[in-house]
Amino acid sequence: AIAAVITFLILFTIFGNALVILAVLTSRSLRAPQNLFLVSLAAADILVATLIIPFSLANELLGYWYFRRTWCEVYLALDVLFCTSSIVHLCAISLDRYWAVSRALEYNSKRTPRRIKCIILTVWLIAAVISLPPLIYKGDQGPQPRGRPQCKLNQEAWYILASSIGSFFAPCLIMILVYLRIYLIAKRSHCRGPRAKGAPGKGESKQTGQASLGAPSSAKLPNLVSRLVAAREANRHSKSTGEKVEGETPEGPGTPGVPPSWPPLPSSGRGQEEDIYRASPEEEAGDDEEEECEPQAVPVSPASACSPPLQQPQGSRVLATLRGQVLLSRGVGTASGQWWRRRAQLTREKRFTFVLAVVIGVFVLCWFPFFFSYSLGAICPQHCKVPHGLF
């Protein structure tokens, strides 16, 4: 039964990791540089499933080492190499996630395939440094026991502690601290979420004229239109009472309809006066004088009066309301689209980080009993000896 279960796990490991490598190498959407970590990690797991687990299974079932002693030494070194590489890969992936979340703009520009390959090479070098000492320095092995040969890990205390710290405890501590830091960053950004949803980003504030309460959603358009109608009625009333002065530009310091304490509206930068409201073609066919809503005749707030003029995209509309200047149609779509793309990218990063945290948590729980009992045997071999079956 044990042999059947282990054989199934071997085949499942090979098949699943081969699919991961195939997906990353053939799918365009998965060709991001950071996915090279997954390719290297999958390769390490395949090597464990093909070169390590079958011989371990044979050793457990037979009760002794059936193969040559030279292969036993190579087998133990490869065991430490591949398992250490797998764990350190997860540590490198967690650091990559942390840099991608905490230094998004700076790190994404540096996250090139060359840089990722250098990190992967460093991971394999660390694993090699930990796994090669038993091959180079064999130490005092003592008299060989008679009877059936055995293939066991190095029993010297210094190597047990050094390899356990380098292979598991240090990477595990780094991963826990890194994911704790990522969680705090995600929690802080979540607390800022309501404010971010109520107003656009800095770049979008410039595009929308820094509206005092942010760009309105489609649900607020009826209220926006009613305010606009009220503003136009006030403008027509001011024309009939002679309050509007012909020929004045927004740059004029004595603009009527605006309190003297408010700064004048800036020019459009092209030497021409910007229309803040552009009516429909049917209305423009009528009286042009009545269809134009001059900025100085609309009672605007100080925040919108101080804001720069709108850079109106082609085919978009500009509305002047009591709450500031707002771009409609394609203008709003462009600004909000960029904002939502950034939000979607951050959401994907958080989701991927959560999945990796679950995988790493399960991985750590699976490895912890072995490394704990392995290290405990080196610290107090007489009084803290772990039973062979449990080990």
Curated annotation (Swiss-Prot):
Extracellular side: 63-72, 141-156, 380-388
CDD domains listed in its UniProt record: 7tmA_alpha2B_AR (cd15321)
This protein's record includes keyword Cell membrane: yes
PROSITE patterns: G_PROTEIN_RECEP_F1_1 (PS00237), G_PROTEIN_RECEP_F1_2 (PS50262)
Biased composition (Low complexity): 295-309
Composition-biased stretches (Pro residues): 256-266
Region feature Disordered, mapped onto this chain: 194-218, 233-312
Positions bearing the site annotation: Implicated in ligand binding: 79
A GO MF term: alpha2-adrenergic receptor activity
A GO biological-process term: regulation of smooth muscle contraction
Subcellular location: Cell membrane
Disulfide bonds: 72-151
Annotated positions for site Implicated in catechol agonist binding: 163, 167
InterPro entries cross-referenced by the UniProt entry: ADR_fam, ADRA2B_rcpt, GPCR_Rhodpsn, GPCR_Rhodpsn_7TM
Protein role: Alpha-2 adrenergic receptors mediate the catecholamine-induced inhibition of adenylate cyclase through the action of G proteins.
Protein name: Alpha-2B adrenergic receptor
Lineage, broadest ranks: Eukaryota, Metazoa, Chordata, Craniata, Vertebrata
